Each structure stands twice: as structure tokens, then as C-alpha cells.
Amino acid sequence: MKFQMIAAVLLIAFCLCVVVTARMELQDVEDMKNGSFQKRRTCIDTIPKSRCTAFQCKNSMKYRLSFCRKTCGTC
């Protein structure tokens, strides 16, 4: 009985994660169609070497979507 409760809770948590992720992706697609995506999420291709830090190079993808290129291309 305890195992079934744990399995049910895990299944519900997984379903909620899937739903939230899907809604975020749909919102991004709508924003792209409306043209507001680029306004809200402006990306730079490279930054000057003088402003490049190890942290920026390690975390060079600015956003999770593939529309943005690496921000530390010159490091």
C-alpha cells in the first residue's frame, strides 16, 4: 500500500512537470509568432574578450532555447 502511494505521488509530479514544460514551450511559440519573442529575449553572439570571465564561458548558453548562440564565442 505504501509503495502504491509513493508511485502515485511520483506519477502526479511527473505529469505536472510535463504539463508545465509543454505550456512554456507553447508560450514561446506564440511569442515567436507575435514577434514579441525577440523583443523580450535579445541575445548577443559574442562579447569582448575583456568582459569574458570563466563563469560566462562555462555558462555560455544565455537561454535554454536554441535561438540564442553562445555569448562567449571569443574566449
Swiss-Prot record:
Keywords: Cleavage on pair of basic residues, Disulfide bond, Ion channel impairing toxin, Nematocyst, Neurotoxin, Potassium channel impairing toxin, Secreted, Signal, Toxin, Voltage-gated potassium channel impairing toxin. PROSITE patterns: SHKT (PS51670). InterPro entries: ShKT_dom. It comes from the Eukaryota. Coiled coil: none annotated. The record marks I47, K49, R51, S60, M61, Y63, F67 as: Important residue for binding Kv1.3/KCNA3. GO terms for cellular component: extracellular region; nematocyst. Residues 1-22 form the signal peptide. Belongs to the sea anemone type 1 potassium channel toxin family. Type 1a subfamily. In PubMed:21339955, this protein is called kappa-TLTX-Hh1a. The TATX abbreviation is given to this protein since the abbreviation TLTX was already given to a spider family. This is Kappa-thalatoxin-Cad2a. It comes from Cryptodendrum adhaesivum (Adhesive sea anemone).
